[in-house]
């Protein structure tokens, strides 16, 4: 198989394959914070992120959410559909945490009356600034129709994952999604792992996500493996793709 590196990100690399419509995605043993300014190699992180995202994407697919995942290849590699990524990070918040708490001076852990969706322009040179829909459409990053689809899919994913994580004793605090255009429709791309969501244990209220790395609160891989073990018991059968 002929492979060329097309993109090297903070947590994953993308390679071409012999099929122009298919890419290989490889999860890396790298943790980052401060929008990539702090980096650290952590053995085993790529594999555990791969395993968690594999389970979540398979589960969402079974629930009717189309994703870019085609096939799991190895312990850190997947074949995915070649999409045109919409350059927006879509953040949904169920509970006050992170930058939302700091920006608005709200108490950490306060449950929001309804989920809040925020958008950030995917541009490393600009440090991924917050952007509203009027700005995003004016810059032709996305169309109004696509925004409606993105918001509907994001809310549906939130409903599904709140229920799933609740069943394994975890609160879904917030998460980030990315979407791509594929054959005239929008599909879920990127990954879903503790790298791009906040998860709190319902009994201890401890972080089960990348805040462990950001705040130096413990061993990242051990924490991620806790999430993986609980998910595997609940939805391990969905991942046979």
UniProtKB/Swiss-Prot annotation:
It comes from the Bacteria. Coiled coil: none annotated. One of its GO terms (biological process) is 'de novo' IMP biosynthetic process. Its EC number is 6.3.2.6. One of its GO terms (molecular function) is phosphoribosylaminoimidazolesuccinocarboxamide synthase activity. The keyword ATP-binding applies. The keyword Lyase does not apply. Keywords: ATP-binding, Ligase, Nucleotide-binding, Purine biosynthesis. It catalyses: 5-amino-1-(5-phospho-D-ribosyl)imidazole-4-carboxylate + L-aspartate + ATP = (2S)-2-[5-amino-1-(5-phospho-beta-D-ribosyl)imidazole-4-carboxamido]succinate + ADP + phosphate + 2 H(+). Pathway: Purine metabolism; IMP biosynthesis via de novo pathway; 5-amino-1-(5-phospho-D-ribosyl)imidazole-4-carboxamide from 5-amino-1-(5-phospho-D-ribosyl)imidazole-4-carboxylate: step 1/2. Transmembrane segments: none annotated. Pfam families: SAICAR_synt. Belongs to the SAICAR synthetase family. This is Phosphoribosylaminoimidazole-succinocarboxamide synthase. It comes from Latilactobacillus sakei subsp. sakei (strain 23K).
């Amino acid at each position: 198989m002929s492979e060329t590196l097309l993109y090297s990100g903070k947590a994953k690399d993308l390679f071409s394959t012999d099929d122009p419509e298919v890419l290989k995605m490889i999860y890396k043993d790298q943790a980052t914070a401060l929008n990539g300014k702090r980096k650290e190699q952590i053995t085993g992180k790529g594999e555990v992120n791969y395993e968690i995202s594999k389970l979540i994407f398979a589960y969402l697919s079974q629930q009717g959410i189309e994703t870019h995942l085609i096939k799991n290849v190895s312990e850190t590699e997947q074949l995915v559909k070649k999409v045109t990524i919409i350059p927006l990070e879509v953040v949904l918040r169920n509970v006050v945490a992170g930058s939302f708490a700091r920006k608005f001076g709200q108490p950490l852990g306060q449950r929001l009356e309804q989920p809040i969706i925020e958008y950030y322009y995917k541009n490393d040179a600009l440090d991924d600034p917050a952007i509203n829909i009027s700005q995003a459409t004016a810059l032709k990053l996305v169309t109004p129709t696509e925004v409606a689809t993105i918001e509907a899919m994001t809310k549906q994913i939130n409903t599904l994952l709140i229920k799933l994580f609740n069943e394994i004793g975890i609160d879904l605090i917030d998460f980030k999604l990315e979407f791509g255009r594929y054959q005239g429709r929008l599909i879920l791309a990127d990954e879903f792992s503790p790298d791009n969501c906040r998860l709190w244990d319902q009994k201890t209220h401890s972080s089960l996500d990348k805040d462990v790395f950001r705040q130096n609160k413990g061993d990242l891989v051990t924490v991620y493996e806790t999430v993986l073990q609980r998910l595997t018991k609940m939805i391990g059968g969905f991942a046979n793709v």
